[in-house]
């Protein structure tokens, strides 16, 4: 929530509001006790899912996303294997004091200018979840300097000067967290035709050289050789 009365280097213009409840909807509505502003689900830019939520299962989350017709279903899904969502949202970037905007822009910029990261929209998460044999990889972010995060005990003020950065991509298999390297993520993105712009560094005599891929199209053909089946 933007607070116009806060200004200066020591005060964040962002107030982080949290809520609790037995259900997702109850938790969301409970935040109205802490602010006069009205929250609209259609305004969501991204949903941050803690690692504990992803390892325990997505059944309740998916039920809420599919049933609620007020959601735009165009927002991003993000996670972190190192930090809690409240700490991520309470961190101020040197580039943008609005931590929500900074995190969204960092994901999109990494996807379109680097290639080692790709965004995950909620529609893709829903489709992958209900398709057998298909795992979902999530953008993984972290707080670069954790010693400066959450300087106060109150969740209501965002005062940390830590910088949130995009780390890598992860997926969850049988409650196990598997992190992909930049090269592994780029390989997956090439196979899935999700490369929009990527840099590839190749070793050569006397050093390395980097090439930029502006467009890529991959076609997979599977073949079953019955003669090799025992």
Predicted regions and their residues:
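Membrane-proximal alpha-helical signals and transmembrane carboxylates
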Residues: 1-230
């Amino acid at each position: 929530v933007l607070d116009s009365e806060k200004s200066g280097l020591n005060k964040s213009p962002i107030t982080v509001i949290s809520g609790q409840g037995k259900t997702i909807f109850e938790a969301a509505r409970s935040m109205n006790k802490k602010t006069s502003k009205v929250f609209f689900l259609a305004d969501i830019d991204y949903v941050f899912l803690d690692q504990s939520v992803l390892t325990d299962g997505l059944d309740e989350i998916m039920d809420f996303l599919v049933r609620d017709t007020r959601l735009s279903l165009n927002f991003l899904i993000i996670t972190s294997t190192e930090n809690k969502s409240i700490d991520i949202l309470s961190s101020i970037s040197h580039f943008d004091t609005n931590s929500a905007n900074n995190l969204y822009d960092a994901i999109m910029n990494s996807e379109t200018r680097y290639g080692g990261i790709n965004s995950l929209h909620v529609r893709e998460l829903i489709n992958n979840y209900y398709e057998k044999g298909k795992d979902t990889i999530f953008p993984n972010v972290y707080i670069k300097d954790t010693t400066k995060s959450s300087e106060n005990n109150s969740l209501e003020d965002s005062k940390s000067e830590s910088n949130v950065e995009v780390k890598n991509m992860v997926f969850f298999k049988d409650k196990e967290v598997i992190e992909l390297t930049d090269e592994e993520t780029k390989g997956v993105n090439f196979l899935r035709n999700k490369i929009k712009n990527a840099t590839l560094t190749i070793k050569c005599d006397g050093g390395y050289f980097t090439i930029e891929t502006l467009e890529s199209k991959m076609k997979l053909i599977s073949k079953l050789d019955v003669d090799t089946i025992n």
